[in-house]
């Protein structure tokens, strides 16, 4: 429906799959957008697109919203008591800087934007395994590896503390504890955790011998940093 609607304009919608759509026809400097992950749980009005094409986008997005509202699929969803899919959020556009080598040799993530940037900069990409045991032997031997664990993003954005705690507990069991053991066993040189609040926590192998330092639970450290 949306693709047919936009075919009558100078824009073209490409739906590569159910999760990722791409809009063609806008110059990259005409519309400045915000990633959906930064908007979830916040007032949408504070993050609406800006730029020379913002008014045009708002007009067409309103028309698309009306089309979606009356679409048979949404009527069926409403009859089943499900939320309506009645809006479109645009983000991810931009101008690539000059090509540069990635700081990571391997990137494990499912986010299409991150994977695209990794491939563009020369890094190998793959989906994250279910746990640390699924990493190939020697995956991080002598090279930097980026692992993106983002299952807790929605819970953090919407303030769902229980779900966030459950997901992070799985991270602790499946990832953090095994990777710490690998660091202690000299299979890794260092670990660096980048939290949702932007803080970085780096642990080198030699830090494990600093027994005089008082241990702090990582959850307490995150809470203190966010206070």
Task: Set out the residue ranges of the language-model regions.
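…; additionally, a secondary subgroup of soluble metalloenzymes is captured
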Residues: 1-227
